[in-house]
Every structure is written in structure tokens, then in C-alpha cells.
Curated annotation (Swiss-Prot):
GO BP field: L-arabinose catabolic process to xylulose 5-phosphate; pentose metabolic process
EC numbers on record: 2.7.1.16
Entry protein name: Ribulokinase
Factors inducing expression: Transcription is repressed by glucose and by the binding of AraR to the operon promoter. L-arabinose acts as an inducer by inhibiting the binding of AraR to the DNA, thus allowing expression of the gene.
UniProt key word Kinase: yes
Highest taxon, organism lineage: Bacteria
Similarity field: Belongs to the ribulokinase family.
Length: 560
């Protein structure tokens, strides 16, 4: 019997699964919440206040995930570690950290623990927007070809704007860093003791391509003179394709996890992209939505097309032999959680408690009794900026049509609908750019738990939606890549299509559009597009308001 382990490092926790290599059966799962969660107000040790739009993490939390979840899998199943042939990991991205020459994160060194820029910058760290704006302006002026691969704009969430922020605001941290690395690649570095960067993280998040490499030293010098040789000084390390073996588990990490030294370790992956084989997708025309705090949209293509506002397209970035496309929405589950935590009245909290259900479930039940358009509400889903297709973290959310009779469930439904409209806009943009999308798949917590949301997505997109058979698709995907890293000789696979066919899975559930609802959503979506054009491109009132807010925040901070 052969097994692999997949570990998925999410926004708030890490989860691991132990999977049977031949059948894809998930024998056990284990979850570890991050002790420091998201650090977005104060630094953990010093209490130092952080500016707005910051989102940091502590890398020690990631090691705790490995230390607790993997032994838990072994304990739950009784599987002999000698039968575990490989391990794969995936991570949120772009999530980066500066490290020293031994691989130690700078924030874990006493001399840097009071330095905010020494910590992990989480994917939703949006404080680098002005640096992204500058990068995009220079790239446009210089006619840099790489911009087209990223839909015409580099997001503030990606690596280089975040590094620019470090270089400008904390040059001593930039200089002290031996390397700046994706958290995904850092975990693999810890597991096997050698630094091998992933073509997935480098391609989608760091402006690297298999054919052209990184942009030139001259370009980086224009961003910041200290960054001229960044690719040699800070981004060094060989780049390897997903599906390859990065190395073997070290003695130290074997002791930490309970696995055997020499266990195959896969090249790191990104949480969205790794989920593709977990739902059995191995060919173009099928878009997968990974729906959680945010949503990532990924799909395969026969060739590279330029798609406005996409996050990126990378040859062999998702599966070998295909162009892998990515788009996304910065705020989906976070969107709904914000409303539940800040806007739901006590009476609804009490009703949910009496019914022994969560507030999300209560609101979904109530909202499900409404017809599309019945509330007269329309929202823009930009509570955390817009990733695709406008690529602007400085845009903010909006709700239109409220009256004194508006109810919480109506607002909740409008927020859900707004995220569905955003997904439809992404789908249409791909299609208009020559990338076919014939089938829609969904994975993640929302797809797993909320039929109300998924039916709205089916109605808004007017497409059937198939659902992942695993509640932890990224972890299953990582386990599949762990089987590839081990190879057929060790009981794994040499072919991703065979691995996906045997280990990937779907539920027997398909959400089918309601024709009557879809007709109403055609009208509502047309109005949504008008709002997107006006507030996203014509009137910059959202940005002006944000500027005033930040000035007032800075002024208040100085007084305190």
C-alpha cells in the first residue's frame, strides 16, 4: 500500500490529508490554526501599531502546522511511515518573507523582531499599492513585454511591489535579507534542505517566465537603484516545474513530522493551481473556482492569449504541456464574514442561536426566499480591492438601492450576487480574449458548505457548476503532486493525467441554472457592469475617499 500527504497552508490555518495513492481515498485529515493568525493591527511581541492595509504572518506558525498535523495523521490511521512515499505542499500566494543565508526568517532573529518588514507579507497585504502603480507606470513607459502576461497590470499583491516597499521603507531589512522567498518555497526549503523555487510561484507572482526569465537589471534599477541586481542577490535559486521532485525529507524534518528521512518532497505549489487535478481537470476549457476568503479562477489553455486584467498566464504553470491561466477576486468569504461580524443585529444572532445554526446559514435561509432583484439592491464586491479585471487594491466596496425597509438578508444576498457578477465578468473577459470556457467547477469551503451561494453563481453565470469531491481540494492536489514526486517506481505516478484520474474526485452534485432567475440576472448584471465602468474607470471618488481616510489615520496616529 502506498500513501502520500498533502499540506495546504491557507490564510488562517494549515490542513493536511493522508491519501491512498491508487484510489484517492482520504484516510484522515488534520487542521492547525495559526497561533498568530493574520497580524494586521500590532506586532505580536512589541505591540507596535501597523499602518492600514498591512497583513503579516509569523513563519513559526507554518512549522507548527507540520509539527502537529502530520503526526496526527499517523496517529489517526496507524499507517506505517515507510508506506508514505511522498509529500506535497501548497500555499497562499503571493505570500513572501525575507530570510538569512541559513534560511532563517529575519523576523525570528532577535535583532529584527521589532521590524514589521521582517515578517511574512501575506497575500492580502495591500500596502504596496503605490509601488505597484509606479512599477506599472515604468513598465508601460518602457514598453516591457512582461506586462501582457499579467493582463496589463502587476497587482500590489504580487512579489515585486512588496519587495519595492521593503527596499524603500526598510532598506536595512532589504540589505540584511540573503533572499526574499515565497512562503511555499520556504516550506519546501525547510523540508528537504535545498532551495528550489517553483515555476508556479515565480511565474504567476514574480514576473518570471520560462522563455524570458526575469525582467532586466535596468528595469529593476528604475524601480529602485538598490534593486538593480535583485534577481541575482535576492531571488537566486534554481526554478523547477510543479510535478517535479524538489528533494528528500531531511533527518531534522523527519524527526519533526514522524515521517522517514528520504521521503520524496514535491516542488511547491499555489493553493488554487494545485486544486486543478484534485477535481480531475487535465484539459482546457474547464475553469475551476477555489472559493474561500477570496476566489481564484484557474484554467488550462492550448496556447497563450492576452487577457485584460488576468493575474497571469504561465507555460506549464499548472500542468505540464499547457498554458495555465489565473484570475481572481480579492474578497469573497471575507466579504460575507465582514457583514456577519459587523452588520447583523442582535435579534438575528439570537435567532441563529435558538435554531442551533450559524448566522451565515440563517441569512442564507432567509435570503433564499427572495427572488433575484426583489430587494432593489446592487453591490460592488470590492471590499478588499479588485484583483480581476481592474487590478486595483485602492478600489472599495459599494451598496446601492437601500431604503428604510432593507433587511439584513437582502444585503447579504446582494453581496453574494456581487461576487457572482465579478466571476461572470472574469469568465466573459477570458472568452472575449479567445480562451474557451465550456465547464465550470468549484472547490473550497463555500462550494462545500453553501448551496444558496452556489445556486446564485449558477444562475448569474448561466452555467452548470460541478463541485469538488474533496472538502480540502488543495491538500488533495498537493498529495497528488507528492505522488508525482515519488514516481511510478516508488508506487506513485509519472503522468499527471493518470494521477488525476485515479486520485481526483467530484461530488454527485451539479448546480444547474434556473432559467427564470438567469433572465433577471441578465438585467442586473448589465447594471453591475455600468457601476464597474463608472466607479472603476471614470470616477475616482473611492480613491479620493481612501486618501482622505489614510491622511486622517496618519494624523491621529501621530497625535497618539
Amino acid at each position: 500500500m502506498a500513501y502520500t500527504i498533502g499540506v495546504d497552508f491557507g490564510t488562517l490555518s494549515g490542513r493536511a490529508v493522508l491519501v491512498h495513492v491508487q484510489t484517492g481515498e482520504e484516510l484522515a485529515a488534520a487542521v492547525k490554526e495559526y497561533r498568530h493568525a493574520v497580524i494586521d493591527t500590532v506586532l505580536p511581541k512589541t505591540g507596535q501599531k501597523l499602518p492600514r492595509d498591512w497583513a503579516l504572518q509569523h513563519p513559526a506558525d507554518y512549522l507548527e502546522v507540520l509539527e502537529t498535523t502530520i503526526p496526527s495523521l499517523l496517529e489517526q490511521t496507524g499507517v506505517d511511515p515507510k508506506d508514505i512515499i511522498g509529500i506535497g505542499i501548497d500555499f497562499t500566494a503571493c505570500t513572501i518573507l525575507p530570510i538569512d543565508s541559513s534560511g532563517q526568517p529575519l523576523c525570528m532573529l532577535p535583532e529584527y523582531e521589532e521590524e514589521p518588514h521582517s515578517y511574512v507579507k501575506l497575500w492580502k497585504h495591500h500596502a504596496a499599492q503605490k509601488h505597484a502603480d509606479r512599477l506599472n507606470q515604468i513598465a508601460e513607459e518602457e514598453g516591457e513585454a512582461f506586462l501582457q502576461r499579467y493582463g496589463g497590470k502587476i497587482s500590489s499583491e504580487w512579489m515585486i511591489p512588496k519587495v519595492m516597499q521593503i527596499a524603500e521603507e526598510a532598506p536595512h531589512i532589504y540589505e540584511a535579507a540573503d533572499r526574499i522567498i515565497e512562503a511555499a518555497d520556504w516550506i519546501v526549503y525547510q523540508l528537504c534542505g535545498s532551495l528550489k523555487r517553483s515555476n508556479c510561484t515565480a511565474g504567476y507572482k514574480a514576473m518570471w517566465s520560462e522563455k524570458a526569465g526575469y525582467p532586466s537589471d535596468d528595469f529593476f534599477e528604475k524601480l529602485n537603484p538598490s534593486m538593480k541586481t535583485i534577481t541575482k542577490d535576492k531571488l537566486s535559486g534554481s526554478i523547477h516545474s510543479v510535478g517535479e521532485k524538489a528533494g528528500s525529507l531531511t533527518e531534522k524534518m523527519a524527526k519533526l513530522t514522524g515521517l522517514l528521512p528520504g521521503t520524496a518532497v514535491a516542488v511547491a505549489n499555489v493553493d488554487a493551481h494545485v486544486s486543478v487535478p484534485a477535481v480531475g481537470i487535465t484539459e482546457p476549457g474547464k475553469m475551476l473556482m477555489i472559493m474561500g476568503t477570496s476566489t481564484c479562477h484557474v484554467l488550462l489553455g492550448e496556447e497563450v492569449h492576452i487577457v485584460p486584467g488576468m493575474c497571469g498566464v504561465v507555460d506549464n504553470g499548472i500542468l505540464p504541456g499547457y498554458a495555465g491561466y489565473e484570475a481572481g477576486q480579492s474578497c469573497v468569504g471575507d466579504h460575507f464574514d465582514w457583514f456577519v461580524k459587523t452588520c447583523v443585529p442582535p435579534a438575528y444572532q439570537e435567532e441563529a442561536k435558538e435554531k442551533n445554526i450559524g448566522v451565515h446559514e440563517l441569512l442564507s435561509e432567509k435570503a433564499n426566499h427572495q427572488a433575484p432583484g426583489e430587494s432593489g439592491l446592487l453591490a460592488l464586491d470590492w471590499w478588499n480591492g479588485n484583483r480581476s479585471t481592474l487590478v486595483d487594491a485602492d478600489l472599495t466596496g459599494m451598496l446601492l438601492g437601500m431604503t428604510l425597509l432593507t433587511k439584513p438578508e437582502e444585503i447579504y444576498r446582494a453581496l453574494v450576487e456581487a461576487t457572482a457578477y465579478g466571476t461572470r465578468m472574469i469568465i466573459e473577459t477570458f472568452k472575449e480574449s479567445g480562451v474557451p470556457i465550456e465547464e465550470l467547477f468549484a472547490a473550497g469551503g463555500i462550494a462545500e458548505k453553501n448551496p444558496f451561494v452556489m445556486q446564485i453563481y449558477a444562475d448569474v453565470t448561466n452555467m452548470d457548476i460541478k463541485i469538488s469531491g474533496s472538502p480540502q481540494a488543495p491538500a488533495l492536489g498537493s498529495a497528488i503532486f507528492g505522488a508525482l514526486a515519488a514516481g511510478k517506481e516508488k508506487g506513485g505516478y509519472d503522468d499527471i493525467k493518470k494521477a488525476a484520474a485515479n486520485m481526483g474526485k467530484l461530488k454527485d452534485i451539479t448546480y444547474t441554472p434556473n432559467a427564470e432567475n438567469a433572465a433577471v440576472y441578465e438585467k442586473l448584471y448589465a447594471e453591475y457592469k455600468e457601476l464597474v465602468h463608472y466607479f472603476g474607470k471614470e470616477n475616482h471618488v473611492m480613491k479620493r475617499l481612501k486618501t482622505i481616510k489614510n491622511l486622517q489615520f496618519s494624523s491621529a496616529a501621530k497625535k497618539n
